[in-house]
Structures are given as C-alpha cells and as structure tokens.
C-alpha cells in the first residue's frame, strides 16, 4: 500500500500511460493512492491502522471457524511466516484455498471471513513524498506517524529544495547552498530529520543515495521493510532545480556523497 504525497513523485509516478507501479502475472502489486500535500503521513498511517484492524477481524473469525475448517489448518494460516517474498507467495496460496472452502460454507461468519480473508496476507505500507512534505508542510503528521510505533515505512525523496514549485530554499537546504530565495547562500542549517527520528528509539533510520551506492540503498529498503515498527529512509535525489543536465544525475549523487 503506497500513500504518495502530492509533488514531483506523484506527477511522474501517477500519470498514465506510463507508471512505475506494476503488477505481476498473478495480478498482484502495489496499491497506489495520492493524498493532499499536507496530510500524506496521516493518510498513510490510516492505511496501516485499517489494515491492522481488518487483520484482527480476519484472525478472530478464522479462530471462530476452527471447528469447521480444522484446527491444524487454521493454525497453519495464522502462524505462517511472512517475511520473505516466497513466504508471501505461499501465504497467498493458502488464503486462496481458504476462500475456496469458505464459498462452500453457508454461514454468516464464513461470508464475513470471505470478505476480509485477503487481509491474512501481510500488508506493507509505504509513505512516499519529497522533502517539502517531510521536513516542512507535512512534518507534524510525519512526526505523529513515527511516534505511533506502527509498522510503517517512509521514503523521503530529498532534493534539498522545494522542487515542485520551482526550486526554492527549504528546511532541507544545507548551509551556504544557493537556491531561489537564497541567492547569496542559505544562512541557516539543514534540518536533521534523521536525528529527530532516531531520538524515538524504535525507528529504523537510513540515508541513501542510489547513484552513489545502489547496493546500500537496496539494503536499506530491505531492512526498513523487515523492521517491525516505523522506518524512514532519507534518499538524496537529483533534480532539475539543481541546474545540471539530469542525464548526469547519478554522477552528481556520487559527487554529493563524496563531498560530504
């Protein structure tokens, strides 16, 4: 489940006929949704709370039907590991079998479980947006989402300027950087969102730059997904507002990391 804040990522990620959000041969893939700029964190947190509630309902109904379905069969579904992709595929197959059984059962509980059975497969929730959302306009909601302790993943595409409105200086812009409204160089410092998240003690935090180290970026994504709790990845992102040809974007990421 993807909650995408309005901004550059929603424009290039949400327009047809091309889209980065794809489904596999079984018709399964990410469910993408776009929220307002200022409340995307709350929007994504709501997805997590809803998924958790529906899972609790499904598990309760499955327990109540263990006499009809078989206690061992119910236990297999409830206790199934769902960390690796292969384990999720197997759980999908279990749930498909469960739904086939439920269709032949004529009771209100079976019908109710059939409507929520898909929730027995683990849901991954990602909140995606830029630094204008995460560092500034949507920061209050983002902080609330991190403090909730819920199993959410946050990906911040950090260009260090307000990209969607033309490249203005923002709270993410580092000291002395030149941008619109800071032509002589920004006098203040860059907001340290990573340290603020770390202060909670239960949040997974990573900084990545795909162009500088793609292996580390992939590892951070996997670790964030595996962390049972809030996670946030601050991904340095190149942007047309930086003033260079974007065909050199990955090289610029490498230079940015090398320069500190």
What label would you give each PLM region?
Residues 4, 12-54:
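Segments that form or flank anion-binding pockets
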Residues 1, 9-23, 103-168, 205, ...:
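Thiamine diphosphate
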Residues 18-35, 143-144, 149-153, 177-180, ...:
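Extended active-site and interfacial segments that coordinate phosphate-rich ligands
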Residues 36-112:
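N-terminal leader/propeptide and maturation segments of large enzyme subunits in energy/redox metabolism
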Residues 34-70, 119-121, 175-226:
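Conserved thiamine diphosphate
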Residues 16, 168, 175-180, 204, ...:
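Active-site cofactor/cluster-binding pocket
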Residues 18-31, 214-260:
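Glycine/aspartate-rich loop-and-adjacent alpha/beta segment that forms the canonical ThDP
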């Amino acid at each position: 489940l993807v909650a995408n804040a309005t901004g550059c990522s929603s424009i290039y990620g949400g327009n047809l006929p091309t889209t980065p959000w794809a489904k596999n041969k079984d018709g399964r893939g990410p469910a993408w949704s776009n929220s307002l700029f200022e409340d995307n964190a709350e929007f994504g947190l709501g997805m997590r709370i809803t998924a958790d509630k529906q899972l609790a309902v499904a598990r309760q109904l499955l327990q109540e039907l263990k006499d009809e379905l078989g206690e061992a069969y119910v236990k297999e579904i409830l206790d199934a590991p769902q960390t690796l992709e292969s384990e999720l595929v197997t759980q999908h197959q279990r749930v498909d079998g469960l739904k086939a059984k439920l269709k032949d059962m004529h009771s209100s509980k079976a019908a109710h479980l059939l409507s929520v059975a898909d929730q027995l497969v683990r849901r991954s929730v990602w909140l995606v947006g830029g630094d204008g959302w995460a560092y500034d306009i949507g920061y209050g909601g983002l902080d609330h989402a991190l403090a909730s302790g819920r199993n959410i993943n946050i990906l911040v595409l950090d260009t260090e300027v307000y990209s969607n409105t033309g490249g203005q200086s923002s709270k993410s812009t580092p000291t002395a950087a030149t941008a619109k409204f800071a032509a002589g160089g920004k006098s203040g410092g860059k907001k340290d969102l990573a340290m603020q998240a770390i202060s909670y003690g239960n949040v997974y935090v990573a900084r990545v730059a795909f162009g500088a180290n793609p292996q580390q970026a992939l590892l951070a994504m996997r670790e964030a997904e595996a962390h049972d709790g809030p996670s946030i990845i601050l991904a340095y992102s190149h942007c047309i507002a930086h003033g260079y040809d974007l065909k050199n974007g990955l090289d610029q990421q490498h230079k940015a990391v090398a320069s500190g």
